[in-house]
Design a protein with these regions (language model features):
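Bacterial N-terminal signal peptides
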Residues: 11-20
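Acidic/His-rich structured neighborhood in mature extracellular/periplasmic domains
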Residues: 112-166, 227
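Extracellular/periplasmic catalytic domains that process cell-envelope and extracellular macromolecules
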Residues: 98-100, 124-129, 181, 218-221
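Bacterial N-terminal signal peptides that target proteins for export
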Residues: 2-12
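Active-site acidic/histidine clusters and adjacent loop/turn architecture
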Residues: 36-108, 169-176, 183-186
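Sec/Tat signal peptide C-region and signal peptidase I cleavage site
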Residues: 21-27
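Extended, low-complexity, intrinsically disordered C-terminal regulatory tails
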Residues: 34-37, 89-121, 190-212
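Catalytic cores and adjacent binding grooves of peptidoglycan-active enzymes
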Residues: 28-32, 148-290
């Protein structure tokens, strides 16, 4: 069928408008909704982009749900993706813990397949460099899919959340945090302020405080601690946090946390959905279309 030239021009202009339409719609959507809907990794090279709380992940790797040295809880959330450095860190650390203590690790959330803001649970975990690790040891029995989804690790705090539960606290938790924080890749380890206070008391008594500065007090974090790695080589658009002060963090700063309600803050804070894709680094727009 032959179309008049004028009609062809109209069709061409219409197609140009339609081609641009998805981009304009995506730019106005909440970023958490966009990234949550993407169920697979991007095809581009591995890079952590932007900051931990305003970024995305290129070429993410997934962490298998089962391994000899660890299990990943709640795999249906699809938050088991990270930069290759993070995946390697988890694999090597869990193997080290197994070799030294005879138990594996329970792993919580990493990032979504392409990072980005999550609709609930975390404000960070956006650029593939954050992981939650539980204080509780990996059970000796084989965890099936149902167990991985429903297993609920115990809190290290007492039921009133005002002190350490010494029925659960052992030297293992102290050693686990020490091994983790002394890793050169680790930038920070976030723990509940009461847990930071406990390890400060033990470390000061032992004269073993050189590793404490990376252990940062933060609300919640009574079932798990949050490990954050430094920006990897080759991730030119990754933004590190400011350097930590040369202090063990057991003084005035910690005391201010212990006096605040933040000690008892829930781990399941609802995330505001106001962050738009346009607020993330420009590279993130390409990542969602890759």
């Amino acid at each position: 069928m032959n179309y008049p030239l004028k009609s062809l021009k109209i069709i061409f202009i219409f197609l140009l408008i339609v081609a641009q339409f998805p981009a304009s719609v995506v730019a106005s959507e909440y970023a958490s909704e966009i990234f949550y809907k993407i169920r697979t990794e991007s095809n581009s090279s591995s890079e952590s982009i932007g900051s931990y709380s305003k970024g995305c992940l290129s070429g993410g790797m997934y962490l298998p749900s089962h391994a000899e040295y660890y299990d990943v809880l709640k795999p249906s959330r699809n938050r088991f993706w990270g930069h290759p450095d993070l995946i390697e860190f988890i694999e090597l650390t869990s193997e080290q813990i197994f070799n030294e203590f005879g138990n594996g690790l329970l792993i919580g959330d990493l990032s979504m397949p392409r990072g980005g803001p999550m609709p609930y649970g975390h404000k960070s975990h956006q650029n593939g460099l954050d992981v939650d690790i539980y204080y509780e040891k990996k059970p000796e029995f084989q965890m099936d899919r149902f167990k991985l989804e429903t297993y609920n690790p115990k809190s290290l705090l007492s039921p009133n959340q005002r002190e350490i539960n010494y029925k659960l606290w052992t030297d293992y938790q102290y050693d686990l945090l020490k091994i983790t924080s002394k890793n050169d890749r680790v930038a920070r380890v976030f723990v509940n302020p009461l847990i930071k206070n406990e390890i400060c008391k033990i470390a000061i008594k032992k004269g073993d405080t050189d590793w404490l500065k990376k252990i940062r007090p933060w609300g919640g974090h009574y079932k798990h601690f949050h490990v954050r790695l430094t920006c990897p080589e080759g991730s030119k658009d990754c933004i590190n946090q400011a350097p930590i002060k040369q202090s063990d963090g057991c003084g005035i700063e910690l005391q201010s946390w212990l006096q605040k309600d933040k000690v008892f803050e829930s781990n399941s804070t609802k995330i505001k959905e106001w962050m738009l894709l346009s607020e993330l680094p420009n590279s993130c727009k390409n990542i969602i279309r890759d």
